[in-house]
Amino acid sequence: FEFLLQGPENVEFSDHFKKLCKNPIVVHRIPKLRPNIKLALKEWDKFFRNNAHRYDILWSNQNGLTHLEFLKLAKKYGIKKRIVHGHCATADKFYRFIHPLNRLFVGKYATDFWACGVEAANHFYHGKERKNALVINNAIEVEQFLYNEEVREKLRKEYDISEDCLVVGQVSRLYEKAKNQSFCVKVFSELIKKELNSRLVFIGKGDTTFLKNLAKEYGVEDKVIFTGLKSNVGEMLNILDVFFFPSNFEGLPIVLVEAQANGLPVVTANHLPVARILENYDNSLSLKDEFSIWADKILSVRNSRILDREKVYRKITESGYEIKSSTRELERLFNE
């Protein structure tokens, strides 16, 4: 594998990922399409012209069909297998125009059509491409996420959280446009009225300024914890009692699989793709419902964590999200 990334932003590969790679990780940088489209396309063409002969497969992982240039260039310079892999089931305002337009032409340049879930497949493809689309589950190493009481106790001491405290939270980058974390703060401000001994925990990196100011505005700033980026996400989940995920849009969120692998009750919104594996997964509410109703829902599931690790492991595996079996299937598809 080699990685082709747009823009100069740093990308952090976990130590675990680096160990899995037999060879050093190779990252190629090309400019973003905007603001200078002409320059970007010139550099993109140069990259594919000079490197396409080394590649058997182009695997284009996308949140939307914002452009088809990678696929066009891969076809132009002779890469035989060209995979589009869709990871989102909705588009923001700008891409609501360009995405459906590119859907009409994606079949001209791609050879394989993948998606992380049925909803994402329906969003990315239509006609023949949708009929031929494959759903590729975002699989995980289940053992890393199974509930661990000792780790829970250790982390709660580290963050000065009592054992009887209700801890609600999520794992995600702090990105308001998609993740809707302001909604979490507003619901939590209602929750705290009903259960004073509560905390809201955000596990992930990003600019905290907006959310901290919002928490202060709602009078809960001393009850909200930002852990920053953590490499031990599987362990961090143990600190929670409820996984709260009211995103504006997603594909099929891998974090919902990870949360269920920890046995956590999940409370998410009813417009998102369904990722139900365990019975304590709840997506009955709408983002239009009152914050107090969401708070009541969280309280109703607070004690429903599934502690039977063997049951959880079996359920995740049977649902097709266990990494070893998924890896074998991916290898088969790459070699077709």
Language-model segment annotations:
Residues 1-39, 206-208, 333:
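N-terminal strand-loop element at the rim of the active site
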Residues 4-5, 265-269:
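Short hydrophobic beta-strand element within catalytic cores of glycosyltransferases
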Residues 119, 139:
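Carbohydrate-associated surface elements
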Residues 144, 306-336:
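A charged, aromatic-enriched C-terminal amphipathic alpha-helix characteristic of glycosyltransferases
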Residues 166, 170-190, 200, 209:
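A conserved mid-protein helix/loop that constitutes part of the nucleotide-sugar donor-binding site
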Residues 212-228:
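Nucleotide-activated donor-binding/catalytic signature segment of Leloir-type glycosyltransferases, i.e.
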Residues 229, 248:
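Aromatic "clamp/platform" in nucleotide-sugar-dependent glycosyltransferases that forms part
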